[in-house]
UniProtKB/Swiss-Prot annotation:
Catalysed reactions, as listed in the record: a very-long-chain 2,3-saturated fatty acyl-CoA + NADP(+) = a very-long-chain (2E)-enoyl-CoA + NADPH + H(+)
Designated name of the protein: Probable very-long-chain enoyl-CoA reductase art-1
Enzyme class: oxidoreductase
Annotated keywords: Endoplasmic reticulum, Fatty acid biosynthesis, Fatty acid metabolism, Lipid biosynthesis, Lipid metabolism, Membrane, NADP, Oxidoreductase, Transmembrane, Transmembrane helix
EC number(s) given by UniProt: 1.3.1.93
Localization per Swiss-Prot or TrEMBL: Endoplasmic reticulum membrane
Membrane topology label: Multi-pass membrane protein
Function: Catalyzes the last of the four reactions of the long-chain fatty acids elongation cycle. This endoplasmic reticulum-bound enzymatic process, allows the addition of 2 carbons to the chain of long- and very long-chain fatty acids/VLCFAs per cycle. This enzyme reduces the trans-2,3-enoyl-CoA fatty acid intermediate to an acyl-CoA that can be further elongated by entering a new cycle of elongation. Thereby, it participates in the production of VLCFAs of different chain lengths that are involved in multiple biological processes as precursors of membrane lipids and lipid mediators.
CDD domains for this protein: Ubl_TECR_like
GO molecular function, one term: very-long-chain enoyl-CoA reductase activity
Family listed: Belongs to the steroid 5-alpha reductase family.
Residue ranges of the TM segments: 112-132, 169-189, 194-214, 255-275
Natural source organism: Caenorhabditis elegans
Length: 308
């Protein structure tokens, strides 16, 4: 293929965005995006979603034009402007840093939030433990974002920064307000309930960390290679025998145990909302595994062993 490539607006298919000449079939979608960005400065590479059909699936950056079945003389692609983009890593750092700042305000400065009612209030051990557990969780997330997760050049719409931060920061304030309140009601089963919840929380947190490390080691740096995730020598990774996304399983378990520890309705609501979203993500990844790997273990579920 060597010829002309016309790129139209995917939303207004009669709107010709740009015509590129001297196109070779060996050029990749990434190379085409770069050429478009050079002539249309507003359409940076990250904002472009190129497709063969206006409502078709976005093409991967490493796909070659010769593999798309296009005309060798005059080819047509469609582009959708994804809008201003922001790096995934930046969004993750912001959304996780917020709860690490918001929650301590309620714990360390209760009079600022609750007024004089907090001056003589006795802080229950569950409240103190919850503060350190919450802080550990989000400090771990920041550590993982900086040193464990691989993001490449992936981006997301800038609006996601507002949406994601609103979710995490808002829930941090919601949970913290009631857990640190001067009228906090201690767990019904006392220290046994608190320390049972703490033990489960700690195990789940390290389980989550273990899975993230395993997933990082599964894909060599600088490659797009994908392999079937399997347990390694760490016993916490054995959950891979039952679910495709044990990192989500451990994440949900952490918040279930946190909710047990503080016996707080806002914590339960936060846990439920998180599970609902992670279940959707897990099911999507589970379907992708089944589609990509013919020999993928059929007995695995997405997030809840034997159930979901």
């Amino acid at each position: 293929m060597s010829g002309i490539l016309e790129v139209y607006d995917a939303k207004r298919t009669d709107n010709l965005i740009i015509t590129l000449e001297g196109i070779s079939g060996s050029e990749t979608i990434k190379a085409i995006k770069k050429r478009i960005a050079q002539k249309k400065l507003k359409l940076t590479e990250e904002r472009q979603a190129l497709r063969v059909e206006p409502k078709g699936k976005p093409l991967a950056d490493d796909q070659k034009l010769s593999d798309l079945g296009l005309s060798s003389q005059k080819a047509v692609l469609y582009v959708r402007d994804l809008g201003p983009q922001i790096a995934w890593k930046t969004v993750f750092m912001a959304e996780y840093a917020g709860p690490l700042f918001v929650y301590p305000l309620f714990y360390l400065r209760p009079t600022f939030i609750y007024g004089q009612a907090a001056v003589n209030a006795t802080m229950h051990p569950a409240v103190q433990i919850a503060f350190f557990a919450w802080s550990f969780h989000y400090a771990k997330r920041l550590f993982e974002t900086q040193f464990i997760h691989r993001f490449g050049n992936s981006t997301m719409p800038q609006f996601n920064l507002v949406k994601n931060c609103s979710y995490y920061w808002g829930f941090a304030a919601f949970v913290a307000y009631f857990v640190n309140h001067p009228l906090f009601t201690p767990p019904a089963f006392g220290d046994l309930q608190v320390y049972f919840g703490l033990a489960g929380f700690v195990i789940s947190e390290f389980g989550n960390l273990s899975i993230h490390i395993l997933l990082r080691n599964l894909r060599p740096a600088g490659t797009r290679e994908r392999r079937i995730p399997k347990p390694d020598g760490n016993p916490l990774s054995l959950l891979f025998n039952y679910v495709s996304c044990p990192n989500y399983t451990y994440e949900v378990a952490s918040w279930i145990f946190f909710s047990i520890m503080v016996q707080s309705l806002p914590a339960i609501i936060f846990t439920t909302a998180g599970f609902a979203q992670m279940a959707i993500w897990a099911q999507g990844k589970h379907r992708n595994y089944l589609k990509e790997f013919p020999d993928y273990p059929k007995n695995r579920k997405a997030i809840v062993p034997f159930v979901l």
